[in-house]
Amino acid sequence: MANVYDLANELERAVRALPEYQAVLTAKAAIENDADAQVLWQDFLAAQSKVQEMMQSGQMPSQEEQDEMSKLGEKIESNDLLKVYFDHQQRLSVYMSDIEKIVFAPMQDLM
């Protein structure tokens, strides 16, 4: 029987080798090399963190915060580097979702 940890490490290497993963890495590097994209990226991460904290504490963003997030979303959509990043990230997430279903299938059997 194969060692489960060896299989998990092999899966990690396989994910890193996916063209979709490599595309996300390339897109991320492009963002890091562009000052405007990097500022928008940092703004996005801060907004995402703020929303997650609010939701975890049972709060909803105010209308003003929602408007700010919409404006940030529009800025992100208009930035080609960030748009490419999120497009590649979406493609990679399809793989990750499929892998998650496969890996957690045995846990579903126990429910």
Swiss-Prot record:
Record Pfam families: Com_YlbF
Highest taxon in the source lineage: Bacteria
InterPro entries (UniProt xref): Com_YlbF (IPR010368), YheA/YmcA-like_dom_sf (IPR023378)
Similarity comment: Belongs to the UPF0342 family.
Designated name of the protein: UPF0342 protein gbs1446
